[in-house]
């Protein structure tokens, strides 16, 4: 569970910003979306490969630019 201590004289905006950062880094939302529905292992592997391929293509394009 993500928790944030309130510092003295800290605005709500700063507190909220720190909370959002911790929340994102903890991967709570990512994990929730991942477990929202079942994905077959074969499809999961296929998606992982395609994401990896796209990432490699982008990196290659950036190096060539």
UniProtKB/Swiss-Prot annotation:
GO biological processes: translation
Region Disordered: start and end of each range? 46-65
Q: A Gene Ontology molecular-function term? A: structural constituent of ribosome
Basic residues composition-biased segments: 46-57
Q: Which InterPro entries match?
A: Ribosomal_bS21 (IPR001911), Ribosomal_bS21_sf (IPR038380)
Q: Which UniProt keywords apply?
A: Ribonucleoprotein, Ribosomal protein
Give the CC-aspect GO terms: ribonucleoprotein complex; ribosome
A Pfam family (short name) is Ribosomal_S21
Q: Which NCBIfam families match?
A: S21p
Membership in a protein family: Belongs to the bacterial ribosomal protein bS21 family.
Question: What is this protein's name?
Answer: Small ribosomal subunit protein bS21
**Native species:** Chlorobaculum tepidum (strain ATCC 49652 / DSM 12025 / NBRC 103806 / TLS) (Chlorobium tepidum)
């Amino acid at each position: 569970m993500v928790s944030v201590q309130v510092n003295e004289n800290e605005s709500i905006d700063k507190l909220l910003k720190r909370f959002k950062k911790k929340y994102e880094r903890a991967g709570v939302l990512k994990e929730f979306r991942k477990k929202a529905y079942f994905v077959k292992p074969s499809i999961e592997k296929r998606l992982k490969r395609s994401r990896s391929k796209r990432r490699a293509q982008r990196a290659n394009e950036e190096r060539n630019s």
